[in-house]
């Protein structure tokens, strides 16, 4: 949703000539320019956190988070396998080891009851993912983390504005990371944000973002790199887009929720289809996702999705292959594994729920968002009924 607000913000930056005012030297611009600071301030107010640090991607912000919470190379970070790749590779980028723990079959988020199975003396952090906009079970996750002295990084890439028991997602763990990639609820083209109430985490994240140096405004630059850092800096143009977009977050989320509520009500009337949302969660629907039972429906998920696409409704089955089934993990290609003293295993079968979700059950609809209407949602429901009513014919065609 791009309008006059975004255009005005972008033109202001272009006319100023300050496209990126980050510098790695003493002065206020070590922390970015005018638009960066304004975007960070607005986002910290929106989430209710003390600190918000803008990055050029959520991947970069996740990497910075792993560093900032104190994970050391060779230590382990527990992540779900049913998520975008960056949740896991952010650990490998720091030469730490991702350990995969299975998800819940109903909400697709990491299952707290499985955490004990993967915990080891090397475990240092957990990254729960609020997948598709639905919150993970944060009470149980935080209790496990507290018992074992672990840090918690919330992956909120798909859940800006979401809540768990009236708490903003990203504010429950030690820090939270958001994405502003073009497909997200609000976007800057590319971009990310780390939020936290911990000053030490904020300072470390700022160092990772800007070449590993910490520049104090009242001291001379020492050119001393305290930690390994990168150029993970957001531009003024992206921040300007973010300023305009963040003011629209509530409206855009409300539109998604309105459409998804209608879809959920209708989907759950059909035996063999199911959408789950916990009552104490504010789901912000990066995508509308439901489970498919091919035995009850009478056709395979692939046939169903192909038929839905033939009706003009884009959908996808499975989301992502569980990450550990990719060659990066199966063959332990990353440098981190060469100096790792643990015994993590990556092989088919270690997270069976994630595998069955990918192979048979999950269907995604990514069109339940503004400017779609309730009439559009009814068209989807009508198409689903049409497919089920004609499943015998579809079965013949697929054989």
Which functions belong to the PLM regions below?
Residues 1-68, 72, 94, 146, ...:
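Conserved PLP-binding active-site segment in aminotransferase class I/II-type PLP enzymes
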Residues 10, 43, 61, 77, ...:
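Generic structural signal for small/hydrophobic residues in well-ordered secondary structure
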Residues 24, 31, 159-165, 172-287:
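Active-site region of PLP-dependent enzymes
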Residues 25, 67-156, 163:
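PLP-dependent aminotransferase-like
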Residues 53, 78, 99, 152-153, ...:
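Structural detector of well-ordered beta-strand residues that form the stable sheet scaffold
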Residues 142-151, 193-211, 299, 303-313:
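Basic phosphate/pyrophosphate-binding loop/patch that engages nucleotide-derived ligands
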Residues 212-221, 262, 305-363, 395-399:
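Conserved PLP cofactor-binding pocket of PLP-dependent enzymes
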Residues 220-230, 264-327, 398-399:
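Conserved small-domain helix->loop->beta segment predominantly found in fold-type I
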């Amino acid at each position: 949703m791009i309008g006059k607000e975004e255009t005005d913000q972008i033109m202001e930056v272009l006319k100023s000539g300050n496209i990126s005012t980050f510098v790695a030297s003493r002065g206020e611009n070590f922390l970015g320019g005018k638009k960066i600071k304004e975007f960070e301030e607005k986002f910290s107010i929106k989430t209710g956190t003390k600190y918000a640090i803008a990055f050029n991607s959520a991947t970069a912000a996740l990497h910075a988070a792993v560093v900032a919470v104190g994970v050391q190379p060779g230590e382990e970070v527990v992540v779900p396998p049913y998520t975008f790749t960056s949740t896991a590779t952010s650990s490998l980028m720091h030469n730490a080891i991702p350990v995969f723990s299975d998800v819940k079959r109903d909400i697709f988020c990491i299952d707290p009851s499985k955490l004990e199975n993967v915990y080891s003396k090397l475990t240092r952090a957990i990254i729960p993912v609020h997948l598709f906009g639905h919150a993970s079970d944060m009470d149980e996750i935080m209790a496990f983390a507290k018992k074992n002295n672990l840090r918690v990084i919330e992956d909120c890439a798909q859940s800006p504005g979401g809540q768990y028991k009236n708490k903003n997602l990203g504010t429950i763990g030690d820090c939270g990371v958001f994405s502003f990639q073009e497909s997200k609820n609000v976007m800057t083209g590319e971009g990310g944000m780390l939020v936290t109430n911990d000053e030490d985490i904020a300072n470390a994240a700022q160092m990772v973002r800007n070449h590993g140096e910490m520049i104090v405004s009242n001291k001379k630059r020492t050119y001393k790199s305290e930690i390994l850092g990168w150029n993970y800096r957001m531009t003024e143009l992206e921040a300007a887009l973010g300023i305009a977009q963040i003011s629209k977050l509530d409206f855009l989320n409300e539109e998604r929720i309105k459409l998804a509520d209608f879809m959920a009500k209708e989907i759950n009337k059909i035996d063999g289809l199911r959408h789950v949302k916990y009552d104490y969660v504010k789901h912000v629907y990066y995508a509308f996702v439901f489970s498919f039972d091919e035995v009850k429906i009478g056709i395979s998920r692939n046939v169903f999705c192909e038929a839905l696409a033939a009706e003009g409704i884009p959908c996808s089955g499975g989301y992502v292959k569980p990450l550990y089934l990719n060659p990066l993990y199966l063959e332990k290609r990353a440098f981190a594994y060469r100096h790792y003293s643990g015994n993590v295993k990556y092989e088919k079968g270690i997270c069976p729920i994630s595998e069955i979700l990918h192979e048979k059950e999950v269907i995604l609809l990514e069109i339940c968002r503004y400017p779609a209407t309730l009439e559009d949602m009814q068209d989807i429901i009508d198409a689903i009924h049409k497919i089920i009513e004609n499943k015998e014919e579809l079965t013949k065609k697929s054989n």
